[in-house]
Amino acid sequence: MEKLERYSEKRKSRQQYFVYPLLFQEYIYAFAHDYALKGFEPVEIVGYNNKKFSSLLVKRLIIRMYQQNFWINSVNHPNQDRLLDHSNHFYSKFYSQILSEGFAIVLEIPFSLGELSCPGEKEIPKFQNLQSIHSIFPFLEEKFLHLHYLSHIEIPYPIHFEILVQLLEYRIQDVPSLHLLRFFLNYYSNWNSLITSMKSIFLLKKENKRLFRFLYNSYVSEYEFFLLFLRKQSSSLRLISSGTFLERIHFSMKMEHFGVMYPRFFQKTLWFFMDPLMHYVRYQGKAILASKGTLLLKKKWKSYLVNFSQYFLSFWTQPQRIRLNQLRNSCFDFLGYRSSVPINTFLVRNQMLENFFLIDTRMKKLDTTAPATPLIGSLSKAQFCTGLGHPISKPIWTDLSDWDILDRFGRICRNLFHYHSGSSKKQALYQLKYILRLSCARTLARKHKSTVRTFMQRLGSVFLEEFFTEEEQVFSLMFAKTTHFSFHGSHSERIWYFDIIRIDDLVNPLTLN
């Protein structure tokens, strides 16, 4: 424990000060508004409330914050809602959203500066063609084939909000900012409860996405901080090189023994490290830890993670959140794919002079497929089909024009095919295409008070073309002269794209809450 405390103190020495005054600068809220516009996804299936940015309202908010007893009254009388002006619903919503997003931007500054000034790290060249979530799968395909055990780790949601604030004290000593953070969190939780309710967490996640991502990623960062500490203590290998990336999502080059990567704290994070015997990869709240060691070593690691989370995070980590399996006998769900490492047997004929003999060869291969059941469940939750996968109409879109309805359905279908292009079996994707196509037809028929058959006959080939991905058309032309397969009917070809920087909402059901 003494080593752990010294390790924590070394990290604490890089704290930043005085970010609170930035809350009184108007340009901070302009940045928050610009982020909200860039973060809007046109394919999003859940409702999105367009909030108009008003510099006049921002100035009024800043003037009110300058008042001497403004924060005191807001904290002492939260029910009166003096900050959010509860008498006017528009002001209440606007002030809550813009102030929390601006506050999240301010809190991100010391974290970014801390990573930029982190001493002792070598500069690693950046590869723009590896800024993709799909880049992790070639890495898994190369490394996981030689490993033995796999641990599935489910990182729990943040615990009591007060512990979140205490964790931030390791990186920020700006007391007014920490008090203001407590003030925000007071709206989403009951401070008398020992454990934060899931309802409060999802409310914060829905209404204040940037602040939620910052808090959650800060929490996960502390979790992985101790994982890195344990790795240093348990291995005699010297960490030859390490690196920190501030890109949104960046994949590290292959280094000799060790690599660290995580993006800005407010984005969805992809983080991994590697050494000759152990590999760790995480995206959001799910992580996998694979190693070459024995079963006893993996059980010790599980015990370490449970005990350290109890000691430092003051949270009882349920042992069942860390599942241990042999890699060759298990499937794991990660980044929207169901992956496994099966052993395939090949019969090879070898001929020497006049004699020939057969060789039974075994090979491991990382097999990635699109899981049909979770994806159909996501479509059902988004009201495109029933729980059994039967297509239904989308009544909320009947007010749109016919072209907008076709465009939305077609874009969702193209995004699903684009993200799951690395699937070795495409049957599930064709099933999703059928559901979306028929749901689109029923939506149009409902709008025009007609039947599905009438609209299928009326639209014809134009309706079908909307549901072919651009990638299928492009690749079928590119490889027409050099290959003998067609991407329109292929069920086994896998393609990894280098332009996917976020996980699709349908692939990640948590974003639909």
Swiss-Prot record:
Entry function: Usually encoded in the trnK tRNA gene intron. Probably assists in splicing its own and other chloroplast group II introns.
Family membership: Belongs to the intron maturase 2 family. MatK subfamily.
UniProt name for this protein: Maturase K
Keywords linked to the UniProt accession: Chloroplast, mRNA processing, Plastid, RNA-binding, tRNA processing
Organism of derivation: Sporobolus indicus
Subcellular localization, as worded in the UniProt entry: Plastid, Chloroplast
Gene name, Swiss-Prot/TrEMBL: matK
Organismal lineage: Eukaryota, Viridiplantae, Streptophyta, Embryophyta, Tracheophyta
PANTHER family: MATURASE K
A GO MF term: RNA binding
Record Pfam families: Intron_maturas2 (PF01348), MatK_N (PF01824)
Entry GO terms, CC: chloroplast
GO biological process: mRNA processing; RNA splicing; tRNA processing
